[in-house]
Amino acid sequence: MMQLKPLFISLMCLVQAHAVQAREYPSPSALRGDADIQKETLIKQLDDSKYAIEMGDLIMVVDAGHGGKILSFKCQDVEVISQSPMRETFGSTFWTSPQKEWNWPPVQEYDKMPYSVEEEEGTLILNSQVSDRLKYRIRKEFATDKKDNSFVITYSIINESGVVRRVAPWEITRVPNEDGLIFFDAPVAGITPVGLMAFTSAEGVSWYRADAADSNRKINADGKGWLAYKNQHLLLVKKFQDLTPTDPAPDEAEIQVYVNRGKTYIELESQGAYTELKPMESLSWTVRWYLLPDSSPVEASKQLIQKVKKVIK
């Protein structure tokens, strides 16, 4: 869940932000507020900037040298994330919300530039540079929890400006537009723009079977704190803070799905609450990722919902 807390900056961060006084940053477990996590994390450095985080037959690869992106997430060596070579079409990234504050392209310091790297208490910690434009720093913490077989990702947004700001966290994960199914707990009638994408209702949730169109499409929805994606071999489930309809940033939403034109890629997006930050304050927001083998038919079913609910309980 999102927590508002005072900022403490490590010496490594100080090298990147000249005018900030060095302070000790709290431990990752203290930041997340989940010190009861049972970690079984194996972190391996693959090259100068890439790190593998392993737990059992699951492996996640993160590139600290290029925006701290998640490049890969596999179960039993089967990939779930888009591996497209084109810019802005692969991996999983993190932005600040609302988008209208920066429009396009994504803020380079968060999405493209190198992050510093630390490893502490079985957690891989990445710190971005401060954005020249927005004056935020992004911190990403990657760990695993063997209690529920999840990858625990905690994002922090740090206000290094001299003024009070309002901001929300935003995770964007790209998957191939192939034979996939996206579903979440929200009424079809509440998905906006109404009728833009072919959502159907079954078993009390909304379902979208990946399709193709000549234009880009994006919807907003007020979900119940989870978002799932099913393909022919895998089930990806994300669990995050459930928001009320008034919690998101202006013109944003708890759950968003973006489908790029043609049969290229789809973005699974979730956001946290729009939060006021005083100078040198930060917010933290945690997303748990679950990836399971699943060769059941790619279609809406009671069994699939039961599997998701068992995972996120």
Please identify what each model-predicted range represents.
Residues K50-D111:
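Acidic-aromatic substrate-binding/catalytic surfaces of carbohydrate-active enzymes
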Residues I138, F151-I153, L283:
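Hydrophobic core residues within well-ordered beta-strands of beta-rich domains
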Residues Q303-K313:
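Short peripheral tails and domain-boundary helices/loops at the edges of structured domains
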Residues P6-V15:
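Sec-dependent N-terminal signal peptides
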Residues A19-A22:
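Boundary at the C-terminal end of the N-terminal hydrophobic targeting segment
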Residues S29-L31, I37-I43, Q99-D148, V164-V167, ...:
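Extended, loop-rich substrate-binding clefts of extracytoplasmic carbohydrate-active enzymes
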